[in-house]
Amino acid sequence: MQQRRPVRRALLSVSDKAGIVEFAQALSARGVELLSTGGTARLLAEKGLPVTEVSDYTGFPEMMDGRVKTLHPKVHGGILGRRGQDDAIMEEHLIQPIDMVVVNLYPFAQTVAREGCSLEDAVENIDIGGPTMVRSAAKNHKDVAIVVKSSDYDAIIKEMDDNEGSLTLATRFDLAIKAFEHTAAYDSMIANYFGSMVPAYHGESKEADGRFPRTLNLNFIKKQDMRYGENSHQQAAFYIEENVKEASVATATQVQGKALSYNNIADTDAALECVKEFAEPACVIVKHANPCGVAIGNSILDAYDRAYKTDPTSAFGGIIAFNRELDAETAQAIISRQFVEVIIAPSASEEALKITAAKQNVRVLTCGQWGERVPGLDFKRVNGGLLVQDRDLGMVGAEELRVVTQRQPTEQELRDALFCWKVAKFVKSNAIVYAKNNMTIGIGAGQMSRVYSAKIAGIKAADEGLEVKGSSMASDAFFPFRDGIDAAAAAGVTCVIQPGGSIRDDEVIAAADEHGIAMLFTDMRHFRH
């Protein structure tokens, strides 16, 4: 079953030359004949390796500025030829068998990511010969090894040493899978790039936005298998995007604790994305993908203490996110006070990790400090389809708000309004958030009726003995009726921030005026479903 195949001849043609010299040296030292092209051949020759240019082997020169190098029967016949079946025809046409192909492709993704990249630049970085060789070798994996990742170089040499210069069929099959994944991702990038240019190329309207191509090709890499999904009867895995530049749960490093669950990852993402909204030291506590306590403070310890007070019951078994390094004092406060599933922060001090290590079930993640939020796409799976939209990075500043009531907000009310508006963006709709002195005091999430979300926020504050009088309230969408304002006023809210836009805005504003409430319109909605 091993079906070993000796590696006697290898063709090397790589764009990313990291590790290629050392790999070629190892192959040559084991008696492997080296074929190569262009820059790869020159590099290997400069390092003193015995290498045959493909053009010398085929008797056909590279041409058209390198566009045609390996597209030749003596190359592809050597790769595709079936050992034991095509030997006679290969011998007739002087085609030598090629046992290993080492190829990675022109850097198309890096090229189009560069500012000012032209269509001509992009086109010249579409690899033709490379993918053709990759697919040929992968198709004939029964006889040929295809290597597309430099991370496989060492393992290949080790297996050759363990198998007298041969590779097993299992290894060749695994390498073929990687090869097909590699070319599929490469072609997807090209298709997405060209698809994004359709509107401009054809002079179409803004509605035909290039961010949403006619065909959507997505490429994700499996990071880990999960024990189960959202529920124990569901199987699950976690896939990540390549080359993500922004700090995220997908790129975070787990420095402590047992494996993350499906729900851990979803909740940690919600907590981290919320805490990114704040410049001041901040803490976000999340339960079931909803913030249950958020605060900013003079330090992350202060912020945590205030966030916890919002809803200590819900904080139990929650996810905690910070936008500053986790320090020992804060870690001790958390461990002493509550059970926590995950703590995520840009970094964690050694002293903090010694403290959290006392609780083996606590997972600690570090994600690095983030900069500007990166625009991107959000996806929602529906049965038989996929909804795609821009990532919600919208936010408003004080200068963009419209005061629509007779009373102006005080400075503190305005600060609290902007604070709870940031939080409301991450609460499931219908979302209502009460805040006072830069901390949440009540959160009403996910109710079908907005007025009930407002009532729940008031009940939450009352249950924890938090004073609502003088607080601000944020609503993720407009109030369709005045009842939400009446409920807020009854609880003690004195300032409301909301998008506006209801056909009954006049009634809602009148209700605010009746109660002496200052009301701010953002002209921006933050539904979250």
From Swiss-Prot:
UniProt keyword annotations, A-Z: Acetylation, Hydrolase, Multifunctional enzyme, Purine biosynthesis, Transferase
Species of provenance: Shigella dysenteriae serotype 1 (strain Sd197)
NCBIfam families: PRK00881.1, purH
Entry GO CC: cytosol
Protein name: Bifunctional purine biosynthesis protein PurH
E.C. code: 2.1.2.3, 3.5.4.10
Keyword Oxidoreductase found: no
Catalytic activity: (6R)-10-formyltetrahydrofolate + 5-amino-1-(5-phospho-beta-D-ribosyl)imidazole-4-carboxamide = 5-formamido-1-(5-phospho-D-ribosyl)imidazole-4-carboxamide + (6S)-5,6,7,8-tetrahydrofolate; IMP + H2O = 5-formamido-1-(5-phospho-D-ribosyl)imidazole-4-carboxamide
Recorded name of the encoding gene: purH
Family that this chain belongs to: Belongs to the PurH family.
N6-acetyllysine: modified positions: K287
Domain (MGS-like) ranges: 1-148
HAMAP family the UniProt entry points to: PurH
PROSITE patterns named in the record: MGS
InterPro entries cross-referenced by the UniProt entry: AICAR_Tfase_dup_dom_sf, Cytidine_deaminase-like, MGS-like_dom, MGS-like_dom_sf, PurH-like
